[in-house]
Structure formats: structure tokens, C-alpha cells
């Protein structure tokens, strides 16, 4: 994965996230589930004050080491999003990018994310689109994505563990029930020129792999 993420992050997720974020200078931002820290570093380089939480020791170790070699002022915390609440500040923005569908106990994690926001702050999260979880290979072979058992919750085995399929309504209702108002939903689309230069990503011209939601914490 490159300094600004893999192809999907560079061409689909990052442009969407930064469009939803707007100006970053001076904002307090929590990167919830930061992985190896690429997004936290991008945010800090644009002037945000960043706290980044990651449970996995290998990812956390890499991100913390990068902070020692490139001082951006990022505060890294190794902790579980479902249980950690000890933040020193309230945040203008909490971002959980490609995280919640990897967490078995996702509702406490969403609660902790929204609790960490100041009134009026933004909760932005991205997911593997639960409506269209077919692989690139399936789309290439069939020309469509087949949807099965959409309304159930289950584990989709991955090399890293489970991707937990949940209906989209479960996430949206969880945000609303935690005192937030949904402001914008984006299904990132790949332009044909980028797709032609990156074989294996053609489906994103027609069928979104991701969905990004921005919500605001109500007073």
C-alpha cells in the first residue's frame, strides 16, 4: 500500500473523504481505526490536529515509528474502539474509514465515536458497500454483482479475518439513535479513464464498492 493508500483509497475514498471534510486547518480530528496511519498523516499535513486510535500492534507500531521519523504532532493510541473512551479533547470530526465492518461489536464503537464529538461535529465513516459485496472477479465474469441474504448479518471470510456483512439500515439507524443527523451519503464512482488504466477496477464505473456517510452530532 502506498503513502496515500491503495488504488481504491487514492481514487475513490480519499477524494470523497476530503471533499466531505472541507478546510482542515486547526480542526481536532480523531482517526478511529487508523491502520498504519496513512490517513492520519494526510490530515496532519493539511493542518489538522490528529488523534489516531488503532488496536493492532503491527499497524500501531508502524504508525508510531513514522511519527518519530516525520514529526506531524499526531497522538497515536493503541486501543480498542469498542472500549476506549479516554480522549483528552472533544473532536470537530471523527473519521472511521473502512473500519466498522471489521469490528464484531460495532455498536459500542459507534457510540464511542459519536460521544467523542463536540456538538455540531461531524462523524464520517466509510464501508465496503453492503449492497454490492461481490468481488471484482465475479463482476468481470458475470457483468453484474449477485446479492444474497442481504438482510442477514454474517461473516464474509477474508485473509485478515472477517468482514461483517450488515444491512446498510443497521449503520444508518445506529447513527441516528446516537444523536446524529445524516447529512450526506456518497457512493464513489470511478471515472472511465482511471478504470482503463487500472484493470480489475472496472466495476466501480457502474457499481460502487464503497459508501461514505457524513452525519452531524445534534445539540
Residue ranges and their predicted role:
Residues 161-185:
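Short alpha-helix
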Residues 107-122:
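A short glycine-rich, Lys/Arg-flanked "PGG" loop and its adjoining helix->strand segment in the class I
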Residues 84-94:
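A short acidic, Gly/Pro-enriched loop at the edge of an enzyme's catalytic core
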Residues 178-180, 198-219:
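Core SAM-dependent methyltransferase catalytic element
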Residues 93-107:
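A short SAM/SAH-binding and catalytic strip from SAM-dependent methyltransferases
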Residues 1-25, 38, 42, 62, 123-153:
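Conserved class I S-adenosyl-L-methionine
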Residues 30-32, 36-83:
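Class I SAM-dependent methyltransferase SAM/SAH-binding core
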